[in-house]
Amino acid sequence: MSKRRIAPLTFLRRLLLRILAALAVFWGGGIALFSVVPVPFSAVMAERQISAWLGGEFGYVAHSDWVSMADISPWMGLAVIAAEDQKFPEHWGFDVPAIEKALAHNERNESRIRGASTLSQQTAKNLFLWDGRSWVRKGLEAGLTLGIETVWSKKRILTVYLNIAEFGDGIFGVEAAAQRYFHKPASRLSLSEAALLAAVLPNPIRYKANAPSGYVRSRQAWIMRQMRQLGGESFMTRNQLN
C-alpha cells in the first residue's frame, strides 16, 4: 500500500525536476542568445498579445522596433536610470538598501505596495516571465537576473531594457514610443522627451505620454533634475553605457 502511495509522489517529483531542468536550459539558452542577437519579442509582449486575442481585440498588435544603443539618444538611457535605478552601473542586479526600504514601507502600508526592482530585474521579468507578485515568480526573477548580470554587459542590459519596455498600450521599446508620441526616431529624443517617456514607466497603461497628467509632468520634472545631478551625458560615457 505504501509503495502505491509513494509511486505517484515520485513520479510528480521527477516530472517537476524535468520541467525545471527544461526551463533552466531554455532560459539559459535565451540569455546566451540574446547577449548578441536582437530580441524579437518578450514574454510581456506575448502575454499582452494573447490576452488581447482572447478578449476579442484582434486588431491589437504588440509593436516593437529593435534599435542598437548607437541609435538611441543618450538622454533616454540616462532618463530610465535616473527614474528607475540610479545605482545601475554599480550593483550586480539587486539594490539591497532599496529592497530593505521597500520591505519596511510595505509592512507599514499594505495597501500601497512599493517595489525596488532594478533595471536588470525588470529586464529579466519583461523578457522571460509573467506579471504578478508571487514568491515563485520573484524567485525565478532573481535567478534570471543573476544569469543576465553574469553574461551580459551593463550596456547590453540597458539596450535590451529600452527595446522591450512597455511605453503604452501595444507600444514596446523606445523606437516605437518615439515614433508614436514624437514622430521622430529614438536617436533624436531630447532630454525632456526622454524624461517624459521614463515618467510613465511605473504604469504605462494608466499614465499617458501623449496626454500627461499632473503627476506625470511632476515626475518628468523630477527625472530631469536627477539626470542633471547624475552628470548628464557624461554619466553614460563614464560608465560605458553609450
From Swiss-Prot:
The lineage of its organism: Bacteria, Pseudomonadati, Pseudomonadota, Gammaproteobacteria, Enterobacterales. Keywords: Cell inner membrane, Cell membrane, Cell shape, Cell wall biogenesis/degradation, Glycosyltransferase, Membrane, Peptidoglycan synthesis, Transferase, Transmembrane, Transmembrane helix. InterPro entries: Glyco_trans_51, Lysozyme-like_dom_sf, PBP_transglycosylase, Pep_trsgly. Belongs to the glycosyltransferase 51 family. The chain crosses the membrane at residues 19-39. It is found in: Cell inner membrane. GO terms for molecular function: pentosyltransferase activity; peptidoglycan glycosyltransferase activity. One of its GO terms (biological process) is cell wall organization. It is a single-pass membrane protein. Gene3D superfamilies: Biosynthetic peptidoglycan transglycosylase-like. It catalyses: [GlcNAc-(1->4)-Mur2Ac(oyl-L-Ala-gamma-D-Glu-L-Lys-D-Ala-D-Ala)](n)-di-trans,octa-cis-undecaprenyl diphosphate + beta-D-GlcNAc-(1->4)-Mur2Ac(oyl-L-Ala-gamma-D-Glu-L-Lys-D-Ala-D-Ala)-di-trans,octa-cis-undecaprenyl diphosphate = [GlcNAc-(1->4)-Mur2Ac(oyl-L-Ala-gamma-D-Glu-L-Lys-D-Ala-D-Ala)](n+1)-di-trans,octa-cis-undecaprenyl diphosphate + di-trans,octa-cis-undecaprenyl diphosphate + H(+). Pathway: Cell wall biogenesis; peptidoglycan biosynthesis. This is Biosynthetic peptidoglycan transglycosylase. The keyword Transmembrane applies. One of its GO terms (cellular component) is peptidoglycan-based cell wall. Its EC number is 2.4.99.28. The keyword Ubl conjugation does not apply. Peptidoglycan polymerase that catalyzes glycan chain elongation from lipid-linked precursors. Its main location: membrane. It comes from the Bacteria.
